[in-house]
Amino acid sequence: MAKLRIAFSGIGAVGGYYGGMVAARYQGTIKADIFFIARGENLKAIREKGLQMQLGIRTIHTAPALATDNPAEIGPVDYLFCCTKSYDLEENIQQLKPVIGPETVIIPLLNGLDIEERIHNILPGQEVWKGCVYIGSRLTEPGVVEKFSLKERIFFGNKDANKDKQTELLKLLMYARLNAFNPADIDLHIWKKFFMISTAATATSFFNQPIDEVLAQ
């Protein structure tokens, strides 16, 4: 069985945590090769020292098979996790075309209801699974990700996609010690996340304060 090839684009708070956990579990094994697509000082730090994840009192160091800002150095992958900001999506997808082959599944972990549609506007017919995460994390410095939430969750899926392939990815993520879910109705979870962030954004804008200070009141 050929190794799976999995790429994470955007190694920040979200991509750094999920990409780091998957790389920590699978890098150097016969199961999968993990690739990071990053840029700037963050990429430089990962190349020099690997990725450091601070998980409470525990620290994990890991490194991908390759960290690069040039997707052409990677080539087509089986699964591509897009973890950039929503406003960078179109530019990011254009840059990622060298890692997107006919069999590549794109899983965007971005907030928004129209992410799949926006990707299909650029790549008609490409297989895209919807995704969302619940996590408290941040990039504290180049090459260092801190997860400060007690629990994280990742949801992904596509009701029209091959179920065996979705189960394959679910098992892979769970084996990486992630709280992963492949629900029958992924749209329900996308809407729940949208309502949550919309409410939070409204409150923080109204009070002109970060969410922790709003909640404290």
Which residues does each PLM region occupy?
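Nucleotide donor/acceptor-binding cores
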Residues: 2-4, 78, 152
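Residues at the C-termini of beta-strands that transition into short coil/loop
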Residues: 38, 57, 69-71, 110, ...
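Rossmann-like NAD(P)(H) cofactor-binding subdomain of soluble oxidoreductases
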Residues: 59-144
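Internal alpha-helical scaffold of NAD(P)-dependent oxidoreductase catalytic cores
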Residues: 98-99, 121-127, 142-217
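Short, charged/polar "capping" segments at the starts of alpha-helices
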Residues: 42-45, 116-117, 164-165
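NAD(P)+-binding Rossmann beta1-loop-alpha1 motif at the extreme N-terminus of oxidoreductases
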Residues: 1-56
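Glycine-rich beta-alpha junction loops
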Residues: 41, 111-113, 132-137, 160, ...
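A structural signal for isolated positions on well-ordered beta-strands in alpha/beta enzyme cores
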Residues: 7, 33-35, 107, 129, ...
